[in-house]
Regions:
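Short, acidic/turn-prone active-site loops that include or flank metal/cofactor-
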Residues: 27-28, 52-53, 122-124, 193-195, ...
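Structured adenosyl-cofactor binding patch, chiefly the S-adenosyl-L-methionine
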Residues: 16, 133-138, 199-238
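N-terminal positively charged helical leader segments and presequences
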Residues: 1-83
């Protein structure tokens, strides 16, 4: 993965990710550039000071005076997530296609201290620099599972004492999210930006919930909706 965001580089350094290359502009100086240099020296990460135009050639115009090439992000297995759980809170993302939404959801999930994020491999946004940037660098702290079959993963979670909560817009077959008892082991399913949670995953959910909102809008953005549910779960869990 290649990144040109200062916050992303700083988080990657803090999390001891493997840097293949790191270039820093000789013409930029601010406290975050100084922080990058300090962290590199503390963690023995090799970096090169280069002219600004050298970074622009690699990263394009949209960079912040740094450019890094990272080794691939580590992904986890669902078994690792379940066996090492602390909060008993997992987020399942069913075909989230927008990288901005994915990054924002990951940021909220890390802030809510989830044990892991399960992302469908098919019809989902790629894990790339945009996701890293919109997550404000928190992608490197997230424990992500790439799933080839969300239905099988949900079955596994149920077998390991998780309640699966699907989010929907329809109120006739669901309850308000705040009436669900999130103190139990919970896996929250968020659906595609346009289609929502698939009918199969709705059927496989133990409970469907909705978020009450003004009639002035049809629905919340999926990243906003995820934040609402995650922080209600965090509040209840204490």
């Amino acid at each position: 993965m290649n990144i040109g965001s200062l916050n992303s580089v700083i988080e990657a350094l803090r999390e001891n990710l493997q840097f293949n290359k790191l270039f820093i502009s000789t013409s930029r100086r601010d406290h975050r550039i100084d922080k990058v240099i300090k962290l590199c020296r503390e963690k023995n990460v090799v970096f090169q000071m280069v002219p600004e135009e050298a970074i622009t050639r690699k990263a394009g115009e949209d960079h912040q005076g740094v450019y890094a090439e990272l080794s691939p992000i580590r992904f986890y297995s669902i078994e690792e997530i379940v066996s090492n759980r602390k909060k008993g809170l997992i987020l399942i993302l069913d075909s989230i296609t927008d990288t901005g939404n994915l990054g924002a959801i990951i940021r909220s999930a890390v802030a809510a201290d989830v044990d892991g994020i399960i992302i469908s491999l098919r019809n989902s946004a790629p894990i790339n620099e945009t996701v890293l940037k919109t997550s404000a660098g928190t992608l490197v702290k997230a424990k992500i599972v790439q799933s080839g079959n969300l239905s099988q993963d949900i079955k596994y979670l149920k077998e390991n004492d998780f309640w699966v909560v699907g989010t929907v817009m329809e109120r006739d077959k669901s309850i308000p999210y705040y009436k669900f008892d999130f103190t139990v082991n919970t896996a929250i399913v968020m659906g595609n930006e346009f289609k929502g949670v698939s009918p199969l995953l709705q059927k496989n959910s133990d409970q469907l919930v909705y978020i009450p909102h003004s009639e002035a809008i049809d629905s919340l953005n999926v990243s906003a909706a995820a934040a609402v549910l995650l922080f209600e779960a965090l509040r209840q869990k204490g």
